[in-house]
Regions:
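Short hydrophobic beta-strand element within catalytic cores of glycosyltransferases
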Residues: 53-56
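Short alpha-helical donor nucleotide-sugar binding micro-motif in glycosyltransferases
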Residues: 16, 23-28, 112
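A charged, aromatic-enriched C-terminal amphipathic alpha-helix characteristic of glycosyltransferases
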Residues: 92-120
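Short glycine/serine-rich donor-binding loops of glycosyltransferases
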Residues: 41-44
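Conserved acidic donor-binding segment of nucleotide-sugar-dependent glycosyltransferases
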Residues: 71-78, 86-90
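Aromatic "clamp/platform" in nucleotide-sugar-dependent glycosyltransferases that forms part
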Residues: 34-36
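Nucleotide-activated donor-binding/catalytic signature segment of Leloir-type glycosyltransferases, i.e.
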Residues: 1-16
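Short acidic/histidine- and often glycine-rich active-site loop of Leloir-type glycosyltransferases
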Residues: 59-72
Length: 121
């Protein structure tokens, strides 16, 4: 699989962080998350913060992010995934503007603090 991906120009990274992650996301054409299980998909949110087109499975955690329907494919449907990726590749590249306000760390921290303060009363 890794050899086939490399020949096709696909990068299968595994876990990365820091400068390497920044370099990958800065130079990526799109971000794909075909997971069948996720919690809050932080990697997806990171890709969105780089304004990348995204292609993600329609599992509940990804659906909660609230992307446009053309970003999703039915989990496990390899043909649908391939078609969606091909569409992204065939389109002229453009950065995508996402509503990231719900994922603002300062806002989230204040909400969590409010929960703890409420518990202490």
């Amino acid at each position: 699989l890794k050899k086939m991906a490399q020949e096709a120009g696909v990068v299968l990274t595994g876990f990365v962080k820091g400068h390497k992650l920044h370099s990958l996301l800065t130079n990526a054409r799109c971000y794909c998350l075909p997971s069948s299980h996720e919690g809050l998909p932080i990697a997806l949110l990171e890709a969105m913060s780089y304004h990348l087109p995204v292609v993600v499975s329609n599992i509940p955690a990804n659906l909660e992010v609230g992307l446009s329907s053309d970003c999703y494919f039915h989990c496990g449907d390899v043909d649908a995934l391939a078609a969606r990726l091909q569409k992204v590749i065939d389109e002229d590249y453009h950065s995508v503007q996402y509503d990231m306000a719900p994922y603002d760390w300062d806002k989230i921290a204040k909400q969590v603090m409010g929960v703890y303060e409420g518990l202490l009363k």
